Amino acid sequence: MLEEIKLKYKITNIDLSKKEQFNIEFRKISPLSKIPAIIDHKNGLSFFQSGAILIYLAELSGKFYDTNNRNLINQWLMAQMGDIGPMLGQHHQFHHYNPGKSEFGEKRYFKISERIYKEL
C-alpha cells in the first residue's frame, strides 16, 4: 500500500524469533504485540491492525477507498480480517509450524483454506 500511494517510509524490523514484539516500546504502538504497525511521524499517530492501517493510508492518500464503493470495500476488508486471514493463519500454524501434532486441526484448516481459495 505504501508503494502504491507513493508514500515515503522507513522499515523497522521486529524479530519475532527474539520476541521483540513484546518489548515495551513496540507495545506502545501495537498493544496486542502484533505486526504490522505504523507510525505517521508527521502527526504523531500510530496504528496497528492491518485493516485500520489500510483505511488510514487510503484516507490519507485519497486512493482506493472511494465513497461509491466503500460498502463493498469494507465488506471484503472485514472478510479478510475476520475470516480469510485468521483461517489461513491457522492452516499455516498447523501445517508449517506443528505438522503431525493434530490431525483434526490439519484436516479442518486444510478444508477451510481450500474452500476459501475456491470461493475467491
Regions found by a protein language model. Give the residues of each.
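Alpha-helical transmembrane segments in multipass membrane proteins, preferentially the mid-helix core
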Residues: 117-120
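GST-like domain detector, emphasizing the conserved glutathione-binding G-site
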Residues: 1-111, 115
